[in-house]
Amino acid sequence: MPAGEGIGDSHELLEFLCDKLPVLDKLCRFKVANTIKCNSCEYSDTKMDSMIEFSIAPRTKKQSVSETIVDAATPFVLGDWTCEKCKNKGCTKQFLVGTFPQLLVFHMTTVNTSVSYTPILVLNGLKYALFAVVCFNGGHWWTYGRDLPPGNDWFTFDDKNVQSHGPQQFPLTENMRLLMYSRLNE
C-alpha cells in the first residue's frame, strides 16, 4: 500500500506522519492525565497518557481556543460512576495537561461550528505563534501557512496554487480543521 493511502482527514494524516517520523512525534507529543476522584471517600485514580494533538469541540459559536482548553480542564461530576473502594456512586473527573510540546496542534472535532483563534497564544506562561491553519470545505482541503517568527507573510496552499498574502492578512476561517502553533523561545 502506498504511503498515506487510506488517510481520510487531517487528524489521520497527522497521526500517520508522527508514526513514520519520530522527530515530528517528539515535537508534537505532550503528557496528559485523567483523574477520577470519589466524592464520598476521596479515593482517586489517575491515568497518565500522551497525545499529539489537542481535540477541541467548542460549546458555543466563536468560543476561543483558550476557552476550550479551560473547559476541557474544568472538573465535572459523573453521577453514575461507582467507586472501587467505598462502592458509593458519584465522582469528579478532570483532564490535566502535564507538559506542553514544541508544536501544539489543535484538532477541531465538530463540524458546522467554529472557534476563534489568534496569531499568538499563551498557555501556562508559554507563548505560541500560529504558523499553519489546515482547512476543509466540501471535499476540498487547503492550508494557510507561514515561516516563523511572526511577522512573515502568510501563504495559501491549494491544489494547484500558492498565493502570497501580507503578514497582516491573518487567515480567519470557519473551515478550520487543524491549528498549528510553534512555541516561541523568548
Predicted regions and their residues:
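Papain-like cysteine protease catalytic cores
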Residues: M1-S55
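Exposed substrate/partner-binding surface patches
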Residues: Y43-E186
